[in-house]
Amino acid sequence: MNDKIVVDVLKLYLKRDPSLTEFHMLKSQYKNIQRVNIFNKEIFISLIKKNKKKFFSDIKSSPSDIKRSILTYFSKQENTYSIGKLYTIIELQSILVTTYTDVLGILTTKGPDLFTSNIYYNTSSMQSLARDALNFMNVAQMTDKTMGRHNVSSLVDNVNSLMEEYLRRHNKNCICYGSYSLHLLNPDVKYGDIDILQTNSRTFLIDLAFLIKFITGLNVVLLKVPYLKNYMVLKDQNDSHIIDSFNIRQDTMQSIPKVLIDNIYIVDPALQLMSMLKMFSQIDRLEDLAKNPEKLTVRLATLLEYVRVNYGINFISNQTKKNNMPMYSVIDIDKRIITVDTSNYDFPFKKCLVYLDESSLSSDILDLNADDAIDFENVSNSAFLINNNILYTYFSNTILMKSKTDIHEISSRGLSAHILIYQILTKGDIIKPLTDIVNSLIGVEKNPIYDIIPRDKKSGKHGIIDIEKDIITH
């Protein structure tokens, strides 16, 4: 590349002659800087204004405020002399100019025809079953602590409106799960933010962060949490939650069974039901249950009604046949490994070794010299490997004990649900074990928690993207 051309591009970008250090350090960014230089900011400003009108109409900011905010950011480099900060500004501006139109700008244009779904689940027959099942699981003490996920930003409703359209336009690479997906099946389910899985989380959240910044003037930050794989959360300046997203590979996306509702793909509720049963092994989720059992009752009833209708599951109130769920599980507390007997089902393995420490699982997989482990990322929170009729996997939640040696039924069911998640994702045998696990919710004893085996502790530092401070650490 001709040095004079590079100097001219840098001079146009910085609105000053670049120093020798700036020239040598920034010339590798020539193409990105050139894209920013030729970017049509007037069209971009128009897109942001349309986004505001459609999704943030209640926010009090004028068109001139928005224009000023955008032009100020695109001239920020002119008064920045730190090479590190310049790199950050260039990276973020480059993401905006190359992706915003396709990611968020498109949401203001006319979309494809909406094929309204007639799917609606009347859960009245499942309400009693769900309420009884949750009552038997309601064995934790209420606490006053507030989990981070409960501190919700005032911008959530605006972002939810945007997300509904985003899910329709980008339904090949973004799907939803959780309370909003159940709301689409049953309007009685209330939801807060919208839980999503997508293949381009980082780009989407950066574009959304800028949209919020330009419209509201607020500084929002993106955090990457070390103990959750490929997870990012967008927070406002009060550290309140706006939206989060798990990033997954395209092959993982293709493995997930989905249901199309109103042009939005949701994770198959059978898979969501298994995730919910698995979740109850986590002690703080049982504390949530103790605080608000009715909220979870309508969600569980919706999931149960879905599997009843779509999987032909029969609920048997007076069970005469032996139910093999939860599958028999034995824990080695010192090794933190649980052995689950899976021999009663037509699985491609006869037992399962469930590791409570992910590093131990990884080490043992290496020792087995096996290279066919499957990792479904955040969908399962574990890799899986079948070797010599044994399924090896990792369980990321706490284990509840009902005695010094016996695993509590809540955790045994959670372990069984984790194994069924593997079966669902690999399209294996599911109907018989699914029938058994949902029927295992009927007529169970309510046992107190004797002890709690802690979950695997993850180390690492939080990553951050702070637009205002020109910081990127992930």
Swiss-Prot record:
GO MF annotations, alphabetized: ATP binding; poly(A) RNA polymerase activity
Enzyme class: transferase
CDD domains assigned: polyA_pol_Pox (cd20919)
Transcription in keyword set: yes
Reactions that this protein is recorded to catalyse: RNA(n) + ATP = RNA(n)-3'-adenine ribonucleotide + diphosphate
Residues spanning the signal sequence: none
Record keywords, A-Z: ATP-binding, mRNA processing, Nucleotide-binding, Transcription, Transferase
Superkingdom of origin: Viruses
Active site: 193, 195
EC numbers on record: 2.7.7.19
Disulphide connectivity of cysteines: none
General function of this protein: Polymerase that creates the 3'-poly(A) tail of mRNA's.
Similarity section: Belongs to the poxviridae poly(A) polymerase catalytic subunit family.
Subunit structure: Heterodimer of a large (catalytic) subunit and a small (regulatory) subunit.
Protein name: Poly(A) polymerase catalytic subunit
Gene it is expressed from: PAPL
